[in-house]
């Protein structure tokens, strides 16, 4: 199986002046060919993110890699929540973290197969735990 490894970390901060909030801008990158999350320095080259795409030090593209952004939120155990994280609440309801045009959301599946979307904020995440991610635990979303 695949194993989870380190995340990318950008030395940037997002500042939201309206809410007086500052958060780290971090990413993790999933490599579909190697079936794992890549580290910032994986192998003999460095990777970066430019315009939402993973690039090598000489600008080469890596289309097999998917970029997932840190949400700025943590689950009830203090684990950082990223796009693609799978969360579970105390009622064993499960959803996946997604970005939409309207912001950060949790996409949950009803018993009848329909989906519903819930806006995410730290208050909402305080009783949720991360039980996996979209790449290594797709079976949790069935």
Report each predicted region and the residues it spans:
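Secondary-structure transition motif
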Residues: 1-142
